[in-house]
């Protein structure tokens, strides 16, 4: 266990062990599982209610299974033209056209909730270990950079496990309530969107862990994480409207690469090259913020 990669892996595995002993991993996984099931159940219920209204209004024969009418409407030329008008013929809409609406609803849920899940799981990890003395045990055995990377990869794997369990639970709800979706064909779609959302979560993980390196308590790290979420949302809104400002401020649009929200549309594309570009950008954001936090941490007295 003398190589850098081995030491990083040891820190990551220990992070898993600590999470399991403290039941933190179990609580987070069960929370994500429950929310995934609830969201999928409510989404399918809404689709079923809308289908009943459409069938009644158009005086059509009732469908035996939920989802048949929704899928037919989603693929209809009239609905496609309406969505094209509102989406402005965007590349994202062109790529998601034809995908099952239940899968798209689950994808929207994932991309909205993963920043909060990452905040709950990881925002205070480094600060807590520094405060309770766990960091001192490791920092006489590994370098600070290796310890930071080990924490990062351990938390990334924990997020992957929680999201994977949530994906299987959501698929179970689809099997029970939406047989028209053909469960065997729905599973790859749910797994695909879960992997893409995990890529998005990686950027937030780097940001939150980077912030956790610069404070001495978990509460302060959590507060900084919440401020970062709100600040990123405000920054994205500002960049969307910066085109109407003066030319000297229009250059701010080039700074959108620093915000995770700017890269997630690439993860909604069908093109593997676009998805790869988005994944690389998000990974770069993660390691940028992690490196900045680690740079401050190297100068701290632990």
Where are these regions (language model features)?
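Aromatic- and glycine-rich beta-strand/loop motifs that create alpha-glucan
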Residues: 1-32
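Alpha-helical transmembrane segments of multi-pass membrane transporters/translocases
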Residues: 4, 117, 264-302
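Alpha-helical transmembrane segments of multipass membrane proteins
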Residues: 15, 171-172, 206-210, 230, ...
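Secretory targeting signals
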Residues: 32, 38-124, 148-219, 265-280
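Transmembrane helix boundary and interhelical loop/hinge segments in multi-pass membrane proteins
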Residues: 119-138, 152, 302
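Residue-level recognition of pore/gate-forming positions within transmembrane alpha-helices
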Residues: 32-36, 154-155, 226-230, 286
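Transmembrane helix segments
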Residues: 38-49, 218-258
């Amino acid at each position: 266990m003398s190589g850098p990669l081995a030491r990083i892996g040891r820190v990551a595995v220990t992070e898993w062990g600590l999470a399991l002993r403290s039941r933190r991993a179990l609580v987070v996984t069960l929370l994500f599982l429950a929310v995934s099931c609830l969201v999928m159940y409510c989404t399918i219920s809404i689709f079923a209610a809308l289908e009943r209204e459409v069938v009644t209004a158009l005086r059509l024969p009732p469908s035996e299974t939920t989802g048949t009418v929704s899928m037919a409407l989603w693929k209809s030329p009239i609905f496609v033209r309406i969505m094209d008008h509102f989406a402005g013929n965007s590349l994202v809409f062109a790529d998601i056209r034809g995908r099952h609406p239940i899968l798209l609803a689950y994808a929207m849920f994932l991309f909205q909730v993963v920043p909060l899940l990452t905040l709950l799981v990881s925002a205070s990890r480094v600060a807590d270990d520094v405060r309770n003395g766990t960091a001192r045990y490791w920092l006489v055995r590994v370098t600070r950079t290796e310890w930071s990377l080990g924490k990062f990869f351990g938390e990334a794997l924990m997020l992957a496990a929680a999201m994977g369990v949530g994906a299987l639970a959501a698929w179970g709800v689809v099997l029970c309530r939406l047989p028209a979706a053909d469960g065997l064909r729905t599973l790859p779609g749910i797994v695909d969107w879960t992997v893409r959302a995990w890529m998005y979560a990686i950027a937030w993980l780097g940001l939150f862990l980077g912030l956790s390196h610069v404070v001495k308590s978990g509460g302060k790290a959590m507060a900084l994480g919440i401020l970062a979420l709100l600040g990123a949302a405000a920054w994205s809104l500002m960049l969307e409207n910066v085109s109407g400002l003066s030319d000297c401020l229009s250059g701010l649009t080039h700074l959108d690469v620093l915000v995770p929200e700017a890269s997630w549309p690439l993860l909604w594309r069908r093109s593997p090259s676009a998805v790869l570009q988005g994944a690389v950008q998000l990974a770069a954001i993660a390691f940028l913020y992690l490196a900045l936090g680690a740079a401050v941490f190297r100068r701290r007295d632990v």
